[in-house]
């Protein structure tokens, strides 16, 4: 039965970034609890990925489950056009409470990429409403903002997953990505490329969009907080809105509730997702200011031209509200600090390994960057055989575990990574 189902999956189901001819092997998960994935064959894996940054409290958290159960008995979904409900109202009150005071208007949607689409449409409508032809977005190389169309246009056109669509995407502007590391020395030369481009194109740039502090899929790099401060200063100088993509970093992952807090700045538009529901169900939000919302609302259209079918889904809103209540108990601060300490203690020594180019740690993120591209199938199989779930990509082996992970489990993940580095055939040389 298990083999038949896996064969069906292999032949018919298209997984993320996977070939249908030679797909990376999938494992069959039966259930998940805490930091453990239980497979149908009885094997248990320690999860080091928190399902792509999302399940920050672990799987099957009783409070999140209860929030979903209580809501599903009332209504699982209702359209959001002309209708509202308490789960959405309660969640949005919380979002306004935990974000900067200037972010007062919230557009709910169903995935991180869509929240970026909405942010881009929001800004385009803003300038159109003011009668200005500003349609270009400025960002930095090695950026990643999602896989939908407008989101792809602000991802690095040469070093992202989206170079195949280059001829079809809107053409935006990319400054050099910052080189000064998060905890390194600041060099004001780091901002020169960005400064030149924003000065040159200030009359056509609609907005700047960045991942604050952490460039995720673009290489898992952590850049200096002063870079973001300088970007904010230049945006203010030229009256250009700043969009910050906190989809991966929001809700405590970097040691701050939002990564932009490391730089003590505030965006004009904020995109959040992934961990917003504790990884239970998909949801995202795009937050903006009174100024931007009022300009759009007073325009000829009178509204933001977007409306997803599952916008404001009550189940997702209920889970997100409970997730924020859990976070507001502030255990996450101690948990993330403990993870960071453990990663620095046990992951940093891998810097001396001959296969390792660099090791980076920030909050509950640990990254081993190798010299060579990784054979993902072989290394992934090795991880599963050794009872851990880690999903490498390109030259990177990284950990973004649930905040509840214990030191012993985290050490186990690191130890398996350390051993995997010794297998020459895991690397494409």
From Swiss-Prot:
**Enzyme class name:** transferase
Tell me which residues bind substrate: 52, 144, 274, 307, 391
Q: What is this protein called?
A: Adenosylmethionine-8-amino-7-oxononanoate aminotransferase
Please name the source species. Buchnera aphidicola subsp. Baizongia pistaciae (strain Bp)
Quote the Pfam families the UniProt record gives. Answer: Aminotran_3 (PF00202)
What catalytic reaction does the record list?
(8S)-8-amino-7-oxononanoate + S-adenosyl-L-methionine = S-adenosyl-4-methylsulfanyl-2-oxobutanoate + (7R,8S)-7,8-diammoniononanoate
Tell me, how does this one assemble?
Homodimer.
Q: Where is this site: Participates in the substrate recognition with KAPA and in a stacking interaction with the adenine ring of SAM?
A: 17
Identify its protein family: Belongs to the class-III pyridoxal-phosphate-dependent aminotransferase family. BioA subfamily.
Pathway info: Cofactor biosynthesis; biotin biosynthesis; 7,8-diaminononanoate from 8-amino-7-oxononanoate (SAM route): step 1/1
